[in-house]
């Protein structure tokens, strides 16, 4: 069984933090070739200015302790990626609400990690997550029965290579993925109990982390 870890970057153990930065570099810079402005020359880790104290990192480890997935959650009440990524001329209504969190830097194999990330967001008070996906990933989510709500233009009319969409964190959404919110919450390992009132928030010893390949969604 994989282990799901959640916490602020500053709260994660140093070895896990370094492994996460290297994993993100391997996926988003080396494999996908994203031109990320905050990546310094000759460095092999990937962070940006959004990886601060408002941001929650989610890390998936294999039973052997290898990093095989990651995600990043940011509250829309603070600066977040979509607002910077998209121009004001896009005419999008960017949310600013404690119940809406942005999902970014998501990489995982299959759909195993995604419901866990949804559960982390729900544990932080979110009732909805927003983010960008490619049309192919949007189709994948729809095949699983998720109700994607388009925040921007419908993909059939949009000229962008990605789609801005939202998912409501309802019991039905978890059920579509064969998951239960309470069960997922209890399986998440929190570092330094970020949300004391959240059921299932615990601190555990984390096994040694190393990188492994992952499919990106």
Q: Positions of the model-derived regions?
A:
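Short amphipathic alpha-helix that is part of the acyltransferase structural core
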Residues: 1-46, 52, 57-67
């Amino acid at each position: 069984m994989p282990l799901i870890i959640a916490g602020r970057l500053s709260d994660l153990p140093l070895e896990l933090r370094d492994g996460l930065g290297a994993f993100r570099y391997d996926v988003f810079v080396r494999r996908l070739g994203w031109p990320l402005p905050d990546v310094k020359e000759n460095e092999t880790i990937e962070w940006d200015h959004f990886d601060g104290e408002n941001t929650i990192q989610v890390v998936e480890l294999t039973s052997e302790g290898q990093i095989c997935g990651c995600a990043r959650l940011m509250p829309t009440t603070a600066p977040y990626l979509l607002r910077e990524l998209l121009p004001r001329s896009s005419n999008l209504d960017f949310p600013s609400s404690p119940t809406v969190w942005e999902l970014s830097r998501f990489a995982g194999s299959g759909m195993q990690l995604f419901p866990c990330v949804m559960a982390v967001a729900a544990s932080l008070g979110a009732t909805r997550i927003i983010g960008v996906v490619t049309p192919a990933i949007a189709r994948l989510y729809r095949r699983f029965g998720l109700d994607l709500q388009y925040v921007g233009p419908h993909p059939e009319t949009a000229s962008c290579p990605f789609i801005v969409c939202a998912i409501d964190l309802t019991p039905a959404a978890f059920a579509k993925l064969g998951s239960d919110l309470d069960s997922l919450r209890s399986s998440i390992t929190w570092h330094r109990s970020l949300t004391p009132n959240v059921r299932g928030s615990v601190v555990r010893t984390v096994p040694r982390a190393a990188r492994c390949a992952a499919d990106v969604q």
